[in-house]
Amino acid sequence: ISGPWSDFFRALGAVILYLMTSIVVLVERGNNSKGAAGVLGLCAAGLFGYDAYITFPSGTRRHTAAPTDPADGPVR
């Protein structure tokens, strides 16, 4: 398991869980603390979404191959 992919799926799973929980809390009518918890959960989901966004491209970048020919001509 590669590091960037596992970090991406960790952040993606957190986004899904926070979104589901926050939407359920916001849909239920209750006191103001439930509303605040739902809004803070949506903010946390946004932060985890941003983390997933910046993590995914860093794992897909490729490095250029190192040159194999000597720079000053063939070796004798």
UniProtKB/Swiss-Prot annotation:
Gene that encodes it: PLP2
Principal location: membrane
Function: May play a role in cell differentiation in the intestinal epithelium.
Subcellular location field: Membrane
Official protein name in the record: Proteolipid protein 2
GO CC term, one of those recorded: membrane
Keywords: Glycoprotein, Membrane, Transmembrane, Transmembrane helix
Domain MARVEL: 1-60
Sugar-modified residues: N31
Membrane topology: Multi-pass membrane protein
Keyword Transmembrane helix listed: yes
